[in-house]
Amino acid sequence: MGAEPEIAIADNRDESRYEIRVDDELAGFTQYRPRPRDAIAFLHTEIDGRFEGQGLGSRLIAFALDDARSRGLGVLPFCPFVKGYIERHPDYLGLVPEAERERFGF
């Protein structure tokens, strides 16, 4: 048996995206745009096909949403994957500003 792969997630602010790496190889990212009034808009999430089915997308989004929460940022889930994650994990719904929830179907 091989060693467990090393998984690292970080905010790459130069690229405006959170990245997930497996053994130092980029496995996926979620692109965002900072918004005025203390919010972050998630635009697109992508996991490389070689890494699909391992739960990396969910780990990436959980990290990004937890980071937004710790920074006091509201979340605008334009990305369908992020929106779906919030639907499946309603404890994150509070990050979506009340005035924006109807827009996203919440």
Which ranges hold each PLM region?
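Active-site rim helix/loop that mediates acceptor-substrate recognition in acyltransferases
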Residues: M1-S16
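Conserved beta-hairpin
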Residues: S16-A27
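Conserved beta-strand in the GNAT
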Residues: E25-R33, A41
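Conserved acetyl-CoA binding element of GNAT-fold acetyltransferases
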Residues: A39-G49
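Conserved acetyl-CoA pyrophosphate-binding loop and the N-cap/start of the following alpha-helix
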Residues: F51, G55-L60
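Conserved acyl-CoA
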Residues: R59-G74
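C-terminal structural segments of small proteins and small subunits
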Residues: S70-R103
